[in-house]
Amino acid sequence: MLAKVAARFSGRRPNRTPGGLDILLLALAWGNLGYAAGLSYLRHVGGHVVRSKGAILECGSGATTLLVAMLCRSTDRQFIVLEHNKTWHDHLQRILDYLGFSHVTLVHAPLVDYGGYRWYRMPRELEIDRIALVVCDGPPSSNPGGRYGLLPTMIDHLAGDCIILMDDTHRRAERHIIDAWTECRCVKASRIGRFGTHAEVVFC
């Protein structure tokens, strides 16, 4: 079913935001509904992908990875995905290979200690363009520091008008991370979704 959904996306106009049916079909085809991003968040991510220009970074991987990959397939945008779990990385890589998504750079990046928090170990040979959009779904909240490491480790790669999309901001831990980011850079956050389940974070 994923191949049929990918074919459906390939037939759409590049600047068209995916509709509710597109998102629903993708979620059903993905199947991992207990852990997958919510429909509202997926649609929000899709809208930002088609409206933005430049490189995209995703922290963590899953349904959002396939969504962004489908929307970027006919473009020359760099799309880098960081995944710490080797088993899950290999599983998703097989899916990407099956769908012919060679434009996605899926990186196995184990979590390492940065002093006070853990974050992905970035391969030295990885070349990263100026990042226009970040989809921040990882590392998991059980990781020391959660998703905090994004800003202190990646700030030099983020464009001045970069937008960071963070899921799960109905949880206190994620909101505290956004507050802590102000120590690295002035940021503004807008919570979105029926219960504020995700947020847009931009630089002041």
Predicted segments with their positions:
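C-terminal substrate-binding/active-site "lid" region of AdoMet-derived donor-dependent transferases
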Residues: P139-C204
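A conserved mid-domain beta-alpha-beta active-site/ligand-binding segment of alpha/beta enzyme cores
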Residues: Y114-P152, H198
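Class I SAM-dependent methyltransferase Rossmann-like catalytic core
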Residues: P18-R51
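S-adenosyl-L-methionine
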Residues: Q93-D129
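Conserved SAM-binding motif I beta-strand of class I
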Residues: R77-E83
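Short alpha-helix immediately C-terminal to the canonical SAM-binding loop
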Residues: H89-D90
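Conserved class I S-adenosyl-L-methionine
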Residues: S52-G62
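Conserved SAM-binding loop of SAM-dependent methyltransferases across substrates and taxa
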Residues: A63-S74
